[in-house]
């Protein structure tokens, strides 16, 4: 169990990374929003879920690709921009901002030889849009299931199959359905880099974005957070879970 003061110190480092990322996005007019547990924390706690040990963000794929190009030149020396290209041992398909002032060992990494950068982190995922049809919903669900079967590393099942080339091809097949952001009747979907979440969202309930309070700062969020969170979570997210479910991903956190 991570001691509360250690976890809080890690959360404040992540908050600093989010503030820096937000400033870069404002400078370059890039869109992003709080996602998953970070959005839930903003709605329910006006900050981190008390036991959360990461930050989740999403970006329209066009903005995500621009950020990929400028990140190395824009980020401060406190942050490592982690991709499978900047860190050859990193086998995940999305990007992370990693703190150079800390280290986190997640439970799935415990007792394994890890060679990639392990600073506390911010996850960033690319988002797409598709036409709102039953055929597209079936295609999306089927594609994510195929990606899951090729994602033992990213889904923390080391005895399973890991096939980066298959994942890449499947994610690219999703991008071929991308329709842009100008029609509120479309659905927003994850780009396949987070295949354990198969939610899709009404574009009109996400854009335009609105600011939401998080740790006494304000950051972009879907304009209807309730719609977004209900699409992700199959439980009443407004209620605190039982104490035995209030667990971190981390086995240990340390600082340099």
Predicted regions and their residues:
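Active-site nucleotide-donor binding segment shared across nucleotidyl transfer reactions
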Residues: 22-55, 59, 64, 232
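Conserved catalytic core of two-metal-ion nucleotidyltransferases
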Residues: 2-26, 71-132, 151-232, 238-256
């Amino acid at each position: 169990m991570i001691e509360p003061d250690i976890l809080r110190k890690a959360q404040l480092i992540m908050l600093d990374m989010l503030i820096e990322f937000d400033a870069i996005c404002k400078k370059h007019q890039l869109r992003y929003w709080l996602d998953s547990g970070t959005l839930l924390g903003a709605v329910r706690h006006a900050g981190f879920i008390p036991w959360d040990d990461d930050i989740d963000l999403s970006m329209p794929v066009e903005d995500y690709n621009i950020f990929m190009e400028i990140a190395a030149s824009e980020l401060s020396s406190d942050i490592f921009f982690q991709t499978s290209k900047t860190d050859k041992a990193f086998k995940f398909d999305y990007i992370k901002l990693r703190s150079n002032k800390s280290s986190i060992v997640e439970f799935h990494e415990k007792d394994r030889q890890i060679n990639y950068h392990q600073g506390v982190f911010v996850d960033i995922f690319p988002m797409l849009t598709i036409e709102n049809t039953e055929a597209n919903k079936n295609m999306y669900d089927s594609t994510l299931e195929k990606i899951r079967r090729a994602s033992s590393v990213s889904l923390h099942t080391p005895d399973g199959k890991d096939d980066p080339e298959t994942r890449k091809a499947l994610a690219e097949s999703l991008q071929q359905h991308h329709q842009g952001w100008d029609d509120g009747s479309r659905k927003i979907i994850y780009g396949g880099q987070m295949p354990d979440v198969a939610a899709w969202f009404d574009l009109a309930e996400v854009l335009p974005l609105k600011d939401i309070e998080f740790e006494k700062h304000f950051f972009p969020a879907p304009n209807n957070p309730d719609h977004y969170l209900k699409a992700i979570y199959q439980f009443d997210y407004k209620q605190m879970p039982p104490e035995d479910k209030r667990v971190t991903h981390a086995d240990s956190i340390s600082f340099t």
